[in-house]
Amino acid sequence: MNIENNEHSFRPHPELGEHISFTKEQPIDIHDSLASLIETVAPLEIDLVLEGETGTGKDTLARKIHRLSGCSGRLIAVNCAAIPETLAESELFGVNNGAYTGAVQARAGYIEEANNGILFLDEIDSMPLSLQAKLLRVLENRGIERLGGTRFIPVNMRVIVATQKPLLTLVEQGTFRRDLYFRLNTLSIQLQPLRSQVEIIIPLFRHFIAKAATTMQCTPPEITQELCEYLLSYSWPGNIRELKTAAKRFTLGLPPLNVPRNAERQGPQLKEILRRIEKSLIHDCLVRHGHSIDEAAMELGMPLRTLYHRIKLLNVTTQRIIV
């Protein structure tokens, strides 16, 4: 199942309930609805797919799920793209003594180390088809055989995979196994790029500056209006990761972005930015008050008729969140 691009709503596994909707994913201060979703799914023994561009916080989200899961085992994070294909099988499944020349000592692989914990496979889209078939067998049998061995080793683990490319598209292209996709895809969460969440850019930038200043033991530099406009107009291809680096550069007294001022300025105009911020604030307020428009209007200090008008104009979802 997958996130639908309708206010970023999704229809989850039956045991999660009827319907949950949310408007954005915020890595530092997670949006109320996504936070509720994570708290719901974290304790459940279901596998997850995280889809999003580089730097959108997939690793951060996987670690948060592990912290909230209550499982006794570790989170074993594996970057599938960083392991040479010739070593991938031994790294994942482990080896027995004498399995190949130079294998003088038996050792467990990443899958075995994830027993009673979570195996996080980042960039799963780079895994060779031959290894995908073996991973599917592990998920079906919940156990492994080390390379060069015949003994079945039971493994009780949960799997979270992350990808920059939509897995269903890769299935259609023939580069990802359809059966593995359906086995993994109990629930899919799509993390939004920073350019579609302009309302969090400045708060996150300030947050990262404060952290950098604490580490460097210096006073956080002031953010000018001109810099704010520049940050909001930038397209952020590196997403949160690039924003964090920009904050560190700015704290050091360097230009925050190592690009010409006339480059990559493809972000939304100020009017659109303000519209998104207002929509986000109204949505968050509705969520806090269980979608009670009366209570939201009181908190916002806004006449009820005006709030109704803004909800309709901005197309703010008012559907009750059910978990």
From Swiss-Prot:
Gene giving rise to this polypeptide: wtsA
Gene Ontology molecular function: ATP binding; ATP hydrolysis activity; sequence-specific DNA binding
Species assigned in the record: Pantoea stewartii subsp. stewartii (Erwinia stewartii)
GO biological process assignments: phosphorelay signal transduction system; regulation of DNA-templated transcription; symbiont-mediated perturbation of host programmed cell death
Residue ranges for the DNA-binding region feature of this UniProt entry: 293-312
Family annotation (Gene3D superfamilies): 1.10.8.60, Homeodomain-like, P-loop containing nucleotide triphosphate hydrolases
Binding locations of ATP: 52-59, 123-132
SMART domains named among the record's database cross-references: AAA (SM00382)
Ranges of residues in domain Sigma-54 factor interaction: 41-251
Name of this protein: Pathogenicity locus probable regulatory protein WtsA
Keywords: Activator, ATP-binding, DNA-binding, Hypersensitive response elicitation, Nucleotide-binding, Transcription, Transcription regulation, Two-component regulatory system
Function: Positive activator of wtsB involved in plant pathogenicity. Probably interacts with sigma-54.
Family matches, as Pfam families: HTH_8 (PF02954), Sigma54_activat (PF00158)
